[in-house]
Amino acid sequence: MSSTTTTTQTTSQVETKAVSKPLGMRVNGKQWHAPKKAFRPGSGLTSYEKRAKERQLLAAVKAKEKELKDEKEAERKRRIEALKEKRAKKEEKERYEKMAEKMHKKRVERLKRKEKRNKLINS
Protein backbone atom coordinates (compact mmCIF):
# COMPACT_ATOMS: atom_id res chain seq x y z
CA MET A 1 0.00 0.00 0.00
CA SER A 2 2.79 2.39 0.79
CA SER A 3 4.35 1.68 -2.60
CA THR A 4 1.20 2.90 -4.40
CA THR A 5 1.13 6.15 -2.43
CA THR A 6 4.76 6.86 -3.23
CA THR A 7 4.16 6.25 -6.94
CA THR A 8 1.21 8.66 -6.95
CA GLN A 9 3.33 11.25 -5.19
CA THR A 10 6.17 10.87 -7.69
CA THR A 11 3.80 11.11 -10.66
CA SER A 12 2.25 14.28 -9.28
CA GLN A 13 5.72 15.75 -8.78
CA VAL A 14 6.66 14.86 -12.36
CA GLU A 15 3.47 16.52 -13.66
CA THR A 16 4.17 19.74 -11.75
CA LYS A 17 7.74 19.80 -13.04
CA ALA A 18 6.53 19.35 -16.61
CA VAL A 19 3.95 22.11 -16.23
CA SER A 20 6.04 24.76 -14.48
CA LYS A 21 9.62 24.53 -15.66
CA PRO A 22 11.89 26.81 -13.63
CA LEU A 23 13.37 29.49 -15.86
CA GLY A 24 16.25 30.46 -13.58
CA MET A 25 17.55 33.97 -12.93
CA ARG A 26 16.92 36.70 -15.44
CA VAL A 27 20.01 38.11 -17.09
CA ASN A 28 18.98 41.74 -16.67
CA GLY A 29 18.21 41.27 -12.98
CA LYS A 30 14.53 42.27 -13.11
CA GLN A 31 13.07 39.16 -11.53
CA TRP A 32 9.86 40.94 -10.51
CA HIS A 33 8.76 41.29 -14.17
CA ALA A 34 6.50 38.62 -15.63
CA PRO A 35 8.17 36.49 -18.34
CA LYS A 36 7.37 37.70 -21.83
CA LYS A 37 5.47 35.63 -24.36
CA ALA A 38 5.30 35.78 -28.15
CA PHE A 39 3.17 38.67 -29.42
CA ARG A 40 0.60 37.17 -31.79
CA PRO A 41 -2.35 39.55 -32.12
CA GLY A 42 -3.86 37.72 -35.11
CA SER A 43 -3.75 34.22 -33.70
CA GLY A 44 -7.08 32.81 -32.72
CA LEU A 45 -9.10 35.41 -34.62
CA THR A 46 -9.69 33.29 -37.72
CA SER A 47 -10.80 29.71 -37.46
CA TYR A 48 -8.99 26.85 -39.16
CA GLU A 49 -11.99 26.17 -41.41
CA LYS A 50 -11.96 29.77 -42.62
CA ARG A 51 -8.22 29.67 -43.34
CA ALA A 52 -8.60 26.33 -45.16
CA LYS A 53 -11.45 27.78 -47.24
CA GLU A 54 -9.33 30.81 -48.16
CA ARG A 55 -6.44 28.56 -49.18
CA GLN A 56 -8.80 26.51 -51.32
CA LEU A 57 -10.15 29.64 -53.02
CA LEU A 58 -6.61 30.91 -53.61
CA ALA A 59 -5.63 27.56 -55.13
CA ALA A 60 -8.66 27.70 -57.44
CA VAL A 61 -7.76 31.23 -58.56
CA LYS A 62 -4.15 30.19 -59.19
CA ALA A 63 -5.33 27.20 -61.26
CA LYS A 64 -7.62 29.43 -63.36
CA GLU A 65 -4.80 31.95 -63.90
CA LYS A 66 -2.46 29.15 -64.97
CA GLU A 67 -5.09 27.81 -67.37
CA LEU A 68 -5.57 31.24 -68.96
CA LYS A 69 -1.82 31.76 -69.17
CA ASP A 70 -1.30 28.38 -70.85
CA GLU A 71 -4.11 29.13 -73.29
CA LYS A 72 -2.54 32.46 -74.17
CA GLU A 73 0.87 30.83 -74.63
CA ALA A 74 -0.60 28.14 -76.90
CA GLU A 75 -2.28 30.80 -79.06
CA ARG A 76 1.02 32.70 -79.28
CA LYS A 77 2.91 29.56 -80.33
CA ARG A 78 0.25 28.77 -82.93
CA ARG A 79 0.60 32.26 -84.45
CA ILE A 80 4.39 31.98 -84.53
CA GLU A 81 4.20 28.55 -86.19
CA ALA A 82 1.74 29.84 -88.82
CA LEU A 83 4.02 32.78 -89.55
CA LYS A 84 7.04 30.49 -89.95
CA GLU A 85 5.12 28.24 -92.34
CA LYS A 86 3.96 31.25 -94.36
CA ARG A 87 7.51 32.57 -94.66
CA ALA A 88 8.86 29.15 -95.67
CA LYS A 89 6.18 28.83 -98.36
CA LYS A 90 6.97 32.31 -99.68
CA GLU A 91 10.69 31.55 -99.74
CA GLU A 92 10.11 28.30 -101.63
CA LYS A 93 7.86 30.06 -104.14
CA GLU A 94 10.53 32.71 -104.77
CA ARG A 95 13.13 29.99 -105.24
CA TYR A 96 10.99 28.24 -107.85
CA GLU A 97 10.37 31.56 -109.62
CA LYS A 98 14.12 32.15 -109.79
CA MET A 99 14.58 28.67 -111.22
CA ALA A 100 11.80 29.30 -113.76
CA GLU A 101 13.66 32.33 -115.09
CA LYS A 102 16.63 30.14 -116.01
CA MET A 103 14.91 26.82 -116.85
CA HIS A 104 11.95 25.64 -118.85
CA LYS A 105 8.55 25.63 -117.13
CA LYS A 106 8.04 21.87 -117.51
CA ARG A 107 11.40 21.07 -115.93
CA VAL A 108 10.63 23.31 -112.93
CA GLU A 109 7.32 21.48 -112.46
CA ARG A 110 9.13 18.12 -112.52
CA LEU A 111 11.63 19.36 -109.91
CA LYS A 112 8.77 20.58 -107.72
CA ARG A 113 7.08 17.19 -107.82
CA LYS A 114 10.35 15.41 -107.11
CA GLU A 115 11.13 17.65 -104.12
CA LYS A 116 7.63 17.17 -102.71
CA ARG A 117 8.06 13.39 -102.94
CA ASN A 118 11.39 13.66 -101.09
CA LYS A 119 9.80 15.85 -98.41
CA LEU A 120 7.04 13.30 -97.86
CA ILE A 121 9.57 10.46 -97.60
CA ASN A 122 11.84 12.36 -95.20
CA SER A 123 9.12 13.66 -92.92
Swiss-Prot record:
InterPro entries (alphabetical): Cgr1-like
Gene Ontology terms describing biological process: rRNA processing
Biased composition regions of type Low complexity, renumbered to the chain: 1-13
Coiled coil: 49-110
Keyword annotations of the record: Coiled coil, Nucleus, Ribosome biogenesis, rRNA processing
GO cellular component: nucleolus
Biased composition range(s): Basic residues: 103-123
Principal cellular location given in the protein's record: nucleus
Chain intervals for the UniProt region annotation (Disordered): 1-47, 85-123
Matches recorded under Pfam families: Cgr1
Biased composition (Basic and acidic residues): 85-102
Location in or out of the cell: Nucleus, Nucleolus
Biological role: Involved in nucleolar integrity and required for processing of the pre-rRNA for the 60S ribosome subunit.
Family note: Belongs to the CGR1 family.
Name this polypeptide is given: rRNA-processing protein cgr-1
Gene label: cgr-1
